[in-house]
Amino acid sequence: MEKERETLQVWKKRVEQELDRVIAFWMEHSHDQEHGGFFTCLGRDGKVYDHLKYVWLQGRQVWMYCRLYRSFERFRRVELLDAARAGGEFLLRYARVAPPGKKCAFVLTRDGRPVKVQRTIFSECFYTMAMNELWKVTGEVRYQSEAIEMMDQIIHWVREDPAGLGRPQLSGALATEPMAVPMMLLSLVEQLGEEDEELTNMYAELGDWCVHRILQHVQRDGQVVLENVSEDGKELPGCLGRHQNPGHTLEAGWFLLQYALRKGDPKLRMHIIDKFLLLPFHSGWDPEHGGLFYFQDADGLCPTQLEWNMKLWWPHSEAMIAFLMGYSDSGDPALLHLFYKVAEYTFRQFRDPEYGEWFGYLNQEGKVALTIKGGPFKGCFHVPRCLAMCEQILGALLQRLEPAPLDSSPAVSTHEGSK
Protein backbone atom coordinates (compact mmCIF):
# COMPACT_ATOMS: atom_id res chain seq x y z
CA MET A 1 0.00 0.00 0.00
CA GLU A 2 2.78 2.43 0.91
CA LYS A 3 4.71 1.67 -2.28
CA GLU A 4 1.56 2.17 -4.35
CA ARG A 5 0.95 5.54 -2.69
CA GLU A 6 4.53 6.64 -3.36
CA THR A 7 4.31 5.68 -7.04
CA LEU A 8 1.00 7.49 -7.46
CA GLN A 9 2.46 10.57 -5.78
CA VAL A 10 5.47 10.54 -8.12
CA TRP A 11 3.21 10.36 -11.14
CA LYS A 12 0.88 13.05 -9.85
CA LYS A 13 3.86 15.38 -9.45
CA ARG A 14 5.19 14.55 -12.91
CA VAL A 15 1.80 15.10 -14.52
CA GLU A 16 1.21 18.34 -12.61
CA GLN A 17 4.58 19.81 -13.61
CA GLU A 18 4.11 18.75 -17.22
CA LEU A 19 0.66 20.38 -17.38
CA ASP A 20 2.18 23.64 -16.17
CA ARG A 21 4.89 23.48 -18.85
CA VAL A 22 2.43 22.64 -21.63
CA ILE A 23 0.05 25.48 -20.79
CA ALA A 24 2.97 27.90 -20.46
CA PHE A 25 3.99 26.97 -24.03
CA TRP A 26 0.57 27.74 -25.49
CA MET A 27 0.13 30.92 -23.47
CA GLU A 28 3.49 32.23 -24.61
CA HIS A 29 3.31 31.35 -28.29
CA SER A 30 -0.28 30.86 -29.52
CA HIS A 31 -2.22 34.00 -28.60
CA ASP A 32 -3.11 36.40 -31.41
CA GLN A 33 -3.19 39.72 -29.57
CA GLU A 34 -4.34 41.60 -32.68
CA HIS A 35 -7.35 39.60 -33.91
CA GLY A 36 -8.13 37.28 -31.02
CA GLY A 37 -8.11 33.52 -31.25
CA PHE A 38 -5.07 31.29 -31.41
CA PHE A 39 -2.26 30.30 -33.71
CA THR A 40 -1.89 26.52 -33.75
CA CYS A 41 0.73 26.13 -36.48
CA LEU A 42 3.72 26.30 -34.15
CA GLY A 43 7.25 25.01 -34.70
CA ARG A 44 9.31 23.17 -32.14
CA ASP A 45 10.31 26.40 -30.39
CA GLY A 46 6.80 27.88 -30.64
CA LYS A 47 7.46 30.09 -33.66
CA VAL A 48 4.36 30.59 -35.82
CA TYR A 49 4.87 29.06 -39.29
CA ASP A 50 1.33 29.64 -40.65
CA HIS A 51 -1.34 32.14 -39.59
CA LEU A 52 -4.36 30.08 -40.68
CA LYS A 53 -6.83 29.33 -37.89
CA TYR A 54 -8.68 26.04 -37.60
CA VAL A 55 -12.13 26.43 -36.08
CA TRP A 56 -12.18 23.08 -34.27
CA LEU A 57 -8.81 23.84 -32.67
CA GLN A 58 -9.97 27.34 -31.70
CA GLY A 59 -12.94 25.79 -29.92
CA ARG A 60 -10.77 23.18 -28.24
CA GLN A 61 -8.36 25.78 -26.84
CA VAL A 62 -11.19 27.96 -25.52
CA TRP A 63 -12.67 24.88 -23.85
CA MET A 64 -9.31 23.82 -22.42
CA TYR A 65 -8.51 27.22 -20.93
CA CYS A 66 -11.97 27.53 -19.38
CA ARG A 67 -11.88 24.00 -17.97
CA LEU A 68 -8.48 24.64 -16.36
CA TYR A 69 -9.67 27.98 -14.99
CA ARG A 70 -12.73 26.30 -13.50
CA SER A 71 -11.04 23.17 -12.14
CA PHE A 72 -7.63 24.19 -10.77
CA GLU A 73 -6.86 26.94 -8.31
CA ARG A 74 -3.43 27.59 -9.85
CA PHE A 75 -5.00 28.23 -13.27
CA ARG A 76 -7.55 30.72 -11.97
CA ARG A 77 -5.60 33.49 -13.67
CA VAL A 78 -7.06 36.50 -15.41
CA GLU A 79 -4.80 36.16 -18.46
CA LEU A 80 -6.09 32.62 -19.07
CA LEU A 81 -9.71 33.72 -18.89
CA ASP A 82 -9.08 36.80 -21.03
CA ALA A 83 -7.49 34.65 -23.74
CA ALA A 84 -10.39 32.19 -23.62
CA ARG A 85 -12.90 35.02 -23.90
CA ALA A 86 -11.00 36.56 -26.82
CA GLY A 87 -11.01 33.16 -28.53
CA GLY A 88 -14.73 32.77 -27.89
CA GLU A 89 -15.50 36.20 -29.30
CA PHE A 90 -13.41 35.38 -32.39
CA LEU A 91 -15.52 32.25 -32.89
CA LEU A 92 -18.77 34.16 -32.38
CA ARG A 93 -17.77 36.72 -35.01
CA TYR A 94 -16.22 34.51 -37.64
CA ALA A 95 -16.77 30.75 -37.23
CA ARG A 96 -20.08 30.51 -39.07
CA VAL A 97 -19.76 30.75 -42.85
CA ALA A 98 -23.11 32.42 -43.59
CA PRO A 99 -24.95 33.55 -40.43
CA PRO A 100 -27.65 33.01 -39.32
CA GLY A 101 -26.85 29.58 -40.77
CA LYS A 102 -25.00 27.34 -38.32
CA LYS A 103 -22.44 25.69 -40.63
CA CYS A 104 -18.95 26.58 -39.46
CA ALA A 105 -15.81 26.91 -41.49
CA PHE A 106 -12.97 24.45 -41.02
CA VAL A 107 -10.23 26.99 -41.77
CA LEU A 108 -10.18 30.79 -41.40
CA THR A 109 -7.62 33.42 -42.26
CA ARG A 110 -5.91 35.15 -39.37
CA ASP A 111 -8.54 37.92 -39.47
CA GLY A 112 -11.47 35.50 -39.71
CA ARG A 113 -12.34 35.10 -43.40
CA PRO A 114 -13.45 31.57 -44.40
CA VAL A 115 -10.98 29.48 -46.39
CA LYS A 116 -12.39 25.96 -46.31
CA VAL A 117 -15.50 24.11 -45.13
CA GLN A 118 -15.62 20.43 -44.15
CA ARG A 119 -18.76 18.39 -44.67
CA THR A 120 -18.70 17.10 -41.10
CA ILE A 121 -19.98 18.16 -37.67
CA PHE A 122 -16.68 18.55 -35.83
CA SER A 123 -16.07 22.30 -36.09
CA GLU A 124 -19.60 22.80 -34.83
CA CYS A 125 -19.13 20.33 -31.98
CA PHE A 126 -16.06 22.08 -30.60
CA TYR A 127 -17.75 25.45 -31.09
CA THR A 128 -20.53 24.10 -28.84
CA MET A 129 -18.08 22.84 -26.20
CA ALA A 130 -16.29 26.19 -26.16
CA MET A 131 -19.48 28.21 -25.74
CA ASN A 132 -20.85 26.01 -22.97
CA GLU A 133 -17.59 26.09 -21.03
CA LEU A 134 -17.34 29.88 -21.46
CA TRP A 135 -20.82 30.19 -19.99
CA LYS A 136 -19.77 28.06 -17.03
CA VAL A 137 -16.86 30.35 -16.15
CA THR A 138 -18.39 33.74 -17.04
CA GLY A 139 -22.10 33.24 -16.36
CA GLU A 140 -22.90 35.11 -19.60
CA VAL A 141 -26.12 33.59 -20.95
CA ARG A 142 -25.35 34.48 -24.59
CA TYR A 143 -22.63 31.84 -24.64
CA GLN A 144 -25.00 29.16 -23.39
CA SER A 145 -27.65 30.21 -25.91
CA GLU A 146 -25.11 29.73 -28.69
CA ALA A 147 -24.19 26.30 -27.33
CA ILE A 148 -27.79 25.07 -27.12
CA GLU A 149 -28.73 26.41 -30.57
CA MET A 150 -25.70 24.77 -32.18
CA MET A 151 -26.36 21.51 -30.31
CA ASP A 152 -29.90 21.46 -31.72
CA GLN A 153 -28.51 21.93 -35.22
CA ILE A 154 -25.94 19.14 -34.80
CA ILE A 155 -28.62 16.73 -33.56
CA HIS A 156 -30.76 17.63 -36.60
CA TRP A 157 -27.89 16.91 -38.98
CA VAL A 158 -27.01 13.59 -37.34
CA ARG A 159 -30.43 12.14 -36.60
CA GLU A 160 -32.83 13.81 -39.02
CA ASP A 161 -31.37 15.37 -42.16
CA PRO A 162 -27.68 15.67 -43.07
CA ALA A 163 -28.37 17.75 -46.19
CA GLY A 164 -27.14 20.94 -44.52
CA LEU A 165 -23.64 19.46 -44.24
CA GLY A 166 -23.35 19.55 -48.04
CA ARG A 167 -22.35 15.93 -48.61
CA PRO A 168 -23.53 14.63 -52.01
CA GLN A 169 -25.53 11.40 -51.94
CA LEU A 170 -23.63 9.17 -54.39
CA SER A 171 -25.19 5.91 -55.58
CA GLY A 172 -22.07 3.81 -55.04
CA ALA A 173 -21.20 5.13 -51.60
CA LEU A 174 -21.85 2.81 -48.67
CA ALA A 175 -24.10 4.13 -45.92
CA THR A 176 -21.45 4.31 -43.20
CA GLU A 177 -21.40 5.28 -39.54
CA PRO A 178 -17.95 6.30 -38.31
CA MET A 179 -17.54 5.82 -34.56
CA ALA A 180 -16.49 9.47 -34.28
CA VAL A 181 -20.05 10.76 -34.75
CA PRO A 182 -21.82 9.07 -31.78
CA MET A 183 -18.63 9.54 -29.74
CA MET A 184 -18.65 13.27 -30.34
CA LEU A 185 -22.35 13.56 -29.54
CA LEU A 186 -21.88 11.56 -26.33
CA SER A 187 -19.10 13.95 -25.34
CA LEU A 188 -21.45 16.89 -25.91
CA VAL A 189 -24.17 15.22 -23.82
CA GLU A 190 -21.63 14.88 -20.99
CA GLN A 191 -20.44 18.47 -21.42
CA LEU A 192 -23.85 20.14 -21.53
CA GLY A 193 -25.41 17.95 -18.85
CA GLU A 194 -22.65 18.44 -16.28
CA GLU A 195 -24.24 19.78 -13.07
CA ASP A 196 -27.35 20.74 -15.08
CA GLU A 197 -30.31 18.51 -14.29
CA GLU A 198 -32.58 20.08 -16.90
CA LEU A 199 -30.13 19.49 -19.76
CA THR A 200 -29.22 16.04 -18.39
CA ASN A 201 -32.87 15.06 -18.70
CA MET A 202 -33.23 16.78 -22.07
CA TYR A 203 -30.35 14.82 -23.60
CA ALA A 204 -30.79 11.50 -21.72
CA GLU A 205 -32.33 9.67 -24.68
CA LEU A 206 -29.65 11.05 -26.99
CA GLY A 207 -26.92 9.76 -24.68
CA ASP A 208 -28.49 6.28 -24.65
CA TRP A 209 -28.70 6.37 -28.46
CA CYS A 210 -25.03 7.35 -28.76
CA VAL A 211 -23.90 4.53 -26.48
CA HIS A 212 -25.97 1.99 -28.42
CA ARG A 213 -24.39 3.17 -31.68
CA ILE A 214 -20.84 3.08 -30.31
CA LEU A 215 -21.30 -0.44 -28.93
CA GLN A 216 -22.34 -1.59 -32.42
CA HIS A 217 -18.71 -1.11 -33.48
CA VAL A 218 -17.77 -4.21 -31.46
CA GLN A 219 -17.85 -6.87 -34.19
CA ARG A 220 -16.91 -10.51 -34.94
CA ASP A 221 -18.36 -11.90 -31.71
CA GLY A 222 -16.54 -9.33 -29.61
CA GLN A 223 -13.09 -9.93 -31.10
CA VAL A 224 -12.57 -6.54 -32.79
CA VAL A 225 -13.70 -2.93 -32.59
CA LEU A 226 -14.10 -1.44 -36.07
CA GLU A 227 -13.94 2.26 -36.83
CA ASN A 228 -16.74 2.12 -39.43
CA VAL A 229 -19.89 0.02 -39.55
CA SER A 230 -23.12 0.18 -41.52
CA GLU A 231 -25.95 2.32 -40.21
CA ASP A 232 -27.65 -0.83 -38.90
CA GLY A 233 -24.50 -1.96 -37.09
CA LYS A 234 -23.05 -4.52 -39.50
CA GLU A 235 -19.48 -4.96 -40.73
CA LEU A 236 -18.73 -3.24 -44.04
CA PRO A 237 -16.73 -4.80 -46.89
CA GLY A 238 -13.21 -3.85 -47.93
CA CYS A 239 -10.55 -1.68 -46.32
CA LEU A 240 -13.18 0.72 -44.97
CA GLY A 241 -14.84 -2.06 -43.00
CA ARG A 242 -11.61 -3.56 -41.67
CA HIS A 243 -10.18 -0.20 -40.58
CA GLN A 244 -9.20 0.05 -36.89
CA ASN A 245 -7.94 2.99 -34.85
CA PRO A 246 -6.76 1.75 -31.42
CA GLY A 247 -6.38 5.24 -29.94
CA HIS A 248 -9.89 6.21 -30.96
CA THR A 249 -11.28 3.05 -29.42
CA LEU A 250 -9.48 3.83 -26.15
CA GLU A 251 -10.87 7.37 -26.19
CA ALA A 252 -14.36 5.95 -26.77
CA GLY A 253 -13.64 3.67 -23.82
CA TRP A 254 -13.34 6.44 -21.28
CA PHE A 255 -16.30 8.32 -22.80
CA LEU A 256 -18.33 5.15 -22.27
CA LEU A 257 -16.93 4.63 -18.76
CA GLN A 258 -18.16 8.09 -17.75
CA TYR A 259 -21.62 7.17 -19.05
CA ALA A 260 -21.64 3.78 -17.28
CA LEU A 261 -20.50 5.32 -13.99
CA ARG A 262 -23.25 7.90 -14.22
CA LYS A 263 -25.79 5.14 -14.91
CA GLY A 264 -24.44 2.87 -12.17
CA ASP A 265 -24.19 -0.08 -14.57
CA PRO A 266 -21.37 -2.45 -13.44
CA LYS A 267 -22.02 -4.99 -16.22
CA LEU A 268 -21.62 -2.31 -18.88
CA ARG A 269 -18.48 -1.03 -17.17
CA MET A 270 -16.83 -4.45 -17.33
CA HIS A 271 -17.83 -4.82 -20.99
CA ILE A 272 -16.26 -1.44 -21.77
CA ILE A 273 -13.01 -2.27 -19.97
CA ASP A 274 -12.76 -5.58 -21.84
CA LYS A 275 -13.67 -4.39 -25.35
CA PHE A 276 -12.66 -0.71 -25.43
CA LEU A 277 -9.58 -0.71 -23.19
CA LEU A 278 -7.90 -4.12 -23.09
CA LEU A 279 -8.76 -5.31 -26.61
CA PRO A 280 -7.40 -2.28 -28.52
CA PHE A 281 -4.33 -2.11 -26.32
CA HIS A 282 -3.34 -5.75 -26.79
CA SER A 283 -3.91 -5.61 -30.55
CA GLY A 284 -2.56 -2.09 -31.04
CA TRP A 285 0.60 -2.00 -28.91
CA ASP A 286 3.83 -2.45 -30.87
CA PRO A 287 5.58 -5.40 -29.16
CA GLU A 288 8.95 -4.54 -30.71
CA HIS A 289 9.29 -0.76 -30.27
CA GLY A 290 6.48 0.10 -27.87
CA GLY A 291 3.73 2.61 -28.50
CA LEU A 292 0.35 2.32 -30.18
CA PHE A 293 0.08 1.87 -33.92
CA TYR A 294 -2.01 4.62 -35.48
CA PHE A 295 -4.12 2.39 -37.75
CA GLN A 296 -4.60 -1.34 -38.14
CA ASP A 297 -6.44 -3.76 -40.41
CA ALA A 298 -8.75 -6.22 -38.64
CA ASP A 299 -7.53 -9.09 -40.84
CA GLY A 300 -3.88 -8.27 -40.27
CA LEU A 301 -3.44 -7.01 -43.84
CA CYS A 302 -1.29 -3.99 -44.59
CA PRO A 303 -3.30 -0.79 -43.98
CA THR A 304 -3.44 1.60 -46.94
CA GLN A 305 -2.78 4.74 -44.90
CA LEU A 306 0.86 5.84 -45.21
CA GLU A 307 1.03 6.78 -41.52
CA TRP A 308 -0.47 3.52 -40.23
CA ASN A 309 2.60 2.43 -38.24
CA MET A 310 3.49 5.85 -36.84
CA LYS A 311 3.08 6.71 -33.16
CA LEU A 312 0.96 9.83 -32.63
CA TRP A 313 0.57 11.93 -29.51
CA TRP A 314 -3.16 11.77 -29.05
CA PRO A 315 -3.79 7.98 -28.90
CA HIS A 316 -1.26 7.78 -26.08
CA SER A 317 -2.89 10.71 -24.28
CA GLU A 318 -6.28 9.01 -24.52
CA ALA A 319 -4.84 5.67 -23.39
CA MET A 320 -3.44 7.29 -20.24
CA ILE A 321 -6.88 8.67 -19.35
CA ALA A 322 -8.65 5.41 -20.18
CA PHE A 323 -6.43 3.11 -18.11
CA LEU A 324 -6.28 5.43 -15.12
CA MET A 325 -10.06 5.92 -15.17
CA GLY A 326 -10.56 2.18 -15.59
CA TYR A 327 -8.32 1.48 -12.60
CA SER A 328 -10.02 4.14 -10.49
CA ASP A 329 -13.37 2.50 -11.22
CA SER A 330 -12.46 -1.19 -11.01
CA GLY A 331 -9.40 -1.33 -8.76
CA ASP A 332 -7.87 -3.85 -11.16
CA PRO A 333 -4.07 -3.51 -10.77
CA ALA A 334 -3.57 -4.70 -14.37
CA LEU A 335 -5.12 -1.43 -15.56
CA LEU A 336 -2.82 0.62 -13.34
CA HIS A 337 0.14 -1.32 -14.76
CA LEU A 338 -1.01 -0.43 -18.28
CA PHE A 339 -1.32 3.23 -17.30
CA TYR A 340 2.28 3.19 -16.07
CA LYS A 341 3.44 1.40 -19.23
CA VAL A 342 1.78 3.89 -21.58
CA ALA A 343 2.72 6.91 -19.46
CA GLU A 344 6.39 5.92 -19.29
CA TYR A 345 6.55 5.49 -23.06
CA THR A 346 4.66 8.73 -23.66
CA PHE A 347 6.75 10.89 -21.33
CA ARG A 348 9.97 9.37 -22.66
CA GLN A 349 9.20 9.66 -26.38
CA PHE A 350 6.82 12.59 -26.92
CA ARG A 351 7.69 15.32 -24.43
CA ASP A 352 10.26 17.95 -25.38
CA PRO A 353 12.36 18.87 -22.31
CA GLU A 354 14.09 21.67 -24.21
CA TYR A 355 11.21 23.79 -25.55
CA GLY A 356 8.15 22.34 -23.83
CA GLU A 357 4.95 20.71 -25.12
CA TRP A 358 5.02 17.38 -26.94
CA PHE A 359 6.05 16.26 -30.38
CA GLY A 360 3.03 14.91 -32.21
CA TYR A 361 4.40 12.51 -34.77
CA LEU A 362 6.96 9.74 -34.25
CA ASN A 363 8.04 6.98 -36.62
CA GLN A 364 7.52 3.35 -35.69
CA GLU A 365 10.82 3.23 -33.80
CA GLY A 366 9.75 6.20 -31.68
CA LYS A 367 12.00 8.82 -33.27
CA VAL A 368 10.60 12.29 -33.97
CA ALA A 369 9.28 12.45 -37.54
CA LEU A 370 7.81 15.98 -37.45
CA THR A 371 9.30 18.58 -35.13
CA ILE A 372 6.20 20.82 -35.14
CA LYS A 373 4.30 21.30 -31.88
CA GLY A 374 1.03 22.27 -33.54
CA GLY A 375 -0.68 22.27 -36.91
CA PRO A 376 -4.06 21.73 -38.60
CA PHE A 377 -4.77 18.71 -36.37
CA LYS A 378 -2.71 19.27 -33.21
CA GLY A 379 -3.61 22.13 -30.89
CA CYS A 380 -3.98 22.84 -27.20
CA PHE A 381 -6.24 19.92 -26.38
CA HIS A 382 -5.29 16.23 -26.16
CA VAL A 383 -2.09 16.74 -24.18
CA PRO A 384 -3.42 19.21 -21.57
CA ARG A 385 -6.77 17.42 -21.29
CA CYS A 386 -4.92 14.17 -20.60
CA LEU A 387 -2.63 15.76 -18.02
CA ALA A 388 -5.46 17.64 -16.29
CA MET A 389 -7.71 14.58 -16.06
CA CYS A 390 -4.88 12.32 -14.92
CA GLU A 391 -3.88 14.84 -12.25
CA GLN A 392 -7.45 14.88 -10.94
CA ILE A 393 -7.82 11.08 -10.97
CA LEU A 394 -4.42 10.57 -9.32
CA GLY A 395 -5.37 13.10 -6.65
CA ALA A 396 -8.62 11.26 -5.96
CA LEU A 397 -6.80 7.91 -5.77
CA LEU A 398 -4.30 9.31 -3.29
CA GLN A 399 -7.12 10.67 -1.15
CA ARG A 400 -8.63 7.19 -1.01
CA LEU A 401 -5.32 5.79 0.20
CA GLU A 402 -4.96 8.32 3.02
CA PRO A 403 -5.18 6.58 6.40
CA ALA A 404 -8.48 7.20 8.15
CA PRO A 405 -8.18 9.89 10.86
CA LEU A 406 -8.34 8.65 14.43
CA ASP A 407 -11.77 9.36 15.84
CA SER A 408 -11.94 9.77 19.61
CA SER A 409 -15.71 10.31 19.64
CA PRO A 410 -17.82 7.59 21.29
CA ALA A 411 -18.99 4.76 19.09
CA VAL A 412 -22.47 5.11 17.59
CA SER A 413 -24.68 2.09 17.04
CA THR A 414 -25.61 1.20 13.48
CA HIS A 415 -29.22 2.05 14.22
CA GLU A 416 -28.39 5.47 15.62
CA GLY A 417 -25.90 6.24 12.89
CA SER A 418 -28.44 5.59 10.17
CA LYS A 419 -30.82 8.24 11.45
Swiss-Prot record:
GO terms for biological process: carbohydrate metabolic process; N-acetylglucosamine metabolic process; N-acetylneuraminate catabolic process. The keyword Mitochondrion does not apply. Its EC number is 5.1.3.8. Transmembrane segments: none annotated. Pfam families: GlcNAc_2-epim (PF07221). The modification Phosphoserine is found at residue 418. The record marks 380 as: Important for enzyme activity. One of its GO terms (molecular function) is identical protein binding. InterPro entries: 6-hairpin_glycosidase_sf (IPR008928), 6hp_glycosidase-like_sf (IPR012341), AGE/CE (IPR010819), AGE_dom (IPR034116). Residues 185-206 are annotated as: Leucine-zipper. Pathway: Amino-sugar metabolism; N-acetylneuraminate degradation. Keywords: Isomerase, Phosphoprotein. It catalyses: an N-acyl-D-glucosamine = an N-acyl-D-mannosamine. Catalyzes the interconversion of N-acetylglucosamine to N-acetylmannosamine. Involved in the N-glycolylneuraminic acid (Neu5Gc) degradation pathway. Belongs to the N-acylglucosamine 2-epimerase family. Homodimer. Forms a heterodimer with renin and inhibits its activity. This is N-acylglucosamine 2-epimerase. The gene is Renbp.
